[in-house]
Amino acid sequence: MTEAPDRDGPAARLDVVVNGEALAVPAATTIDGLIAIVGIERRGVAIAVDGQVVPRSAWRRSVLHCGARVEIVTAAAGG
């Protein structure tokens, strides 16, 4: 399991699955916070939590829950 930086100790963490990989994140992590943790560019990204696409406008207020299955999809140019 990959772990995000420990800010509040192990008791203040929750386990989520991001693109099929387990990740421990701080409790109350939002989608916006998750993007920062995994270090991806925000442009051209779509995110679904538990199979439901989350609008970009909701990323700052959408708090992840323990066991959340997050899919991060990035657009790629090409042909």
Region spans (language model):
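Ubiquitin-like/PB1-type beta-grasp interaction modules and other compact soluble beta-rich domains
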Residues: M1-G78
